[in-house]
Amino acid sequence: MPTVYFAITNHGFGHTTRLSSVIAELQTRCSELNVIIATTAPRWLLESYLSGDFIYHQRSFDVGVIQSDSLNMDKAATLDKLNYIRTNQSELIAQEVEFLHANHVDLIVADIPPLVAAIAAAADIPCWMTGNFGWDFIYQDWVEQGEIEFAEITEWISQLHSQCDRLFRLPFHEPMSGFDNIQDIGFTGGNPRFSREELCDRFEMCSIQPKALLTFGGLSLNAIPYHNLAKFPDWQFITFDRDAPDLPNLKQICGHTLRPVDLMPVCDRVISKPGYSTLSEACRVGVPVVCLTRDGFSEAEILIDGLQDYNHHLIVSPEDFYEGDWQFLNADMQTPRRPEHVPDHHGEVAIAKTILEYL
């Protein structure tokens, strides 16, 4: 029975959900597969996408960006953690090589902790990665803004990427030129489990009332201005925020069974920050997106640019979201600029097929 080891970056929820969609497709196509998932993401998040068995291996090989919420970054703490990993990389590599050999791993797939490429090389196991950007891309932008202490980290990550055997490059991507073998892939993500009619019945929502899903990833936002919802009594809002207030036109989704993508079929808008998984799943479902801008995070510009190309959208500033009156809900959505170039909607299928062909 083949064994595939999946390593997921220690940042937010989006990397976890998009790689989990690949694992779910694999398990559907091949039940005789040992799956190991190395991550610090909560187990419930994995289980919301996966129905098959897996070994939950709590490990962290990178940091991404340390944030207080989905928009605010702590660069100093990020640098400290990166330097710790870099200083202790030999020990981290040796420990994980021992684990890989003990579990007879045949293939490593990562999204997208760079150190895993070195771990795979030391273990003599092929390493494939998936992603739309590398962390060197994020940190290099900081270097160019004057944060020169990230320069050595950026070079280190680029060198690690060169050890990867194959990259599945997702839509909304930067060039990722540090990888030698690149295969472009379509949108990845989960598929909704319910129809619009089933969701309206289950949550007792009026089928003709306009609905907006408020979703901001695993890090959420500080102080979502819920008071603005009172200005739109004809709208039904939906949130996964556990701290949301009790409002007549706000439906709070509790527990971990449902995912944002499961609610998208009933929604006329998704209001979100720029994150790959939310935008990718919204594009797949075909629901328009109201997207906040995000300063200081270079991936956000690429994500927003891609959203404008491929989906109905409206781009708003954090100031309009936090301090404005939310009249963007009454504005006409912008049409996609390049609808004829929309990527394939089944990227997880292409990746799963390639993995199974290799095994």
Give the positions of each predicted feature.
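A short, glycine/small-residue-rich beta-strand->loop->alpha-helix junction that serves as a flexible
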Residues: I8-S20
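Conserved nucleotide-sugar phosphate-binding/catalytic loop shared by glycosyltransferases and other
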Residues: N10, L33-T87
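Donor-nucleotide binding loops and adjacent catalytic segments primarily
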Residues: I23, G190-R269
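Conserved nucleotide-sugar donor-interacting segment of glycosyltransferase catalytic cores
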Residues: Q95-S158
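A donor-sugar binding/catalytic signature common to diverse glycosyltransferases
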Residues: L107-D111, M129, R259-I302
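A nucleotide-sugar donor-handling region in carbohydrate enzymes
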Residues: I138-Y139, E144-L221
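Nucleotide-sugar donor-binding patch of glycosyltransferase catalytic domains
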Residues: Q252-G255, P288-T335
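C-terminal amphipathic helix plus adjacent low-complexity
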Residues: Q327-L359
